[in-house]
Amino acid sequence: MSDKFNKIYDQSISNPEKFWEEAANDIFWFKKPTKILNKSNPPFYKWYEDGITNTCYNALDIHIDQGNGKRTALIYDSPITGNKSKFSYEELRSKVSIFAGALKDQGVNKGDRVIIYMPMIPEAVVAMLACARIGAIHSVVFGGFASNELASRIDDSKAKVLVTASCGFEPGRTVEYKPLVDEAIKLANHKIDKMILFQRSGHEVKLSDPKEVSWEEVVSKANEVD
């Protein structure tokens, strides 16, 4: 194993352009790149700049296209709540496609930034893949992080939308996310356009600002994004 790894590593160092040209063949491209590495403006190198792909398509759709849609794509197993669930590629793509439509309904377009401030639940994965599906850039912030830290990430990313949940569960305690998010929004110089909040069962919170919308509501009105 170590010899194989060392050989691959050496190849990546000795001829990185050739190495990553071959690696690119392992994923799906809508348009294969002909320019592998642009070194004209160091240190701002550009990889695959004329290629077109989609990471959500590579994570989900390609497996469905290959006849594996019924296979398990995601397993959720919470040691805190004891909840367990599985999602096939088809089921996960459906959830992702609908939430991608919900993001677009909230004004999120290609290149826009979305902060994901959530516990480790399936909806966090859905949100990440939905951003990738429409070409938005997501920034994951650890759920429960202090308000000032979240505020700095709002300012750094200039996020248009923040996706969060009503709370997170940790050993021996429940962390209410909404007060932390509210304070972060007050502290941040950059102001988000919308907050999408997923209501966790039994721990629902009141949404009081026009900028605040529930995950359940936006999903119910959204169309899937192919």
Regions found by a protein language model. Name each.
Residues 1-87, 91-94, 98, 180, ...:
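N-lobe entry segment of adenylate-forming
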Residues 56, 74-129, 146, 150, ...:
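Conserved AMP-binding/adenylate-forming core of the ANL superfamily
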Residues 63, 95, 99-102, 106, ...:
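Generic, well-ordered alpha-helical scaffold segments in large soluble proteins
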Residues 133-217:
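Structural core segment of the AMP-binding/adenylate-forming
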Residues 137, 224-226:
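A local structural motif
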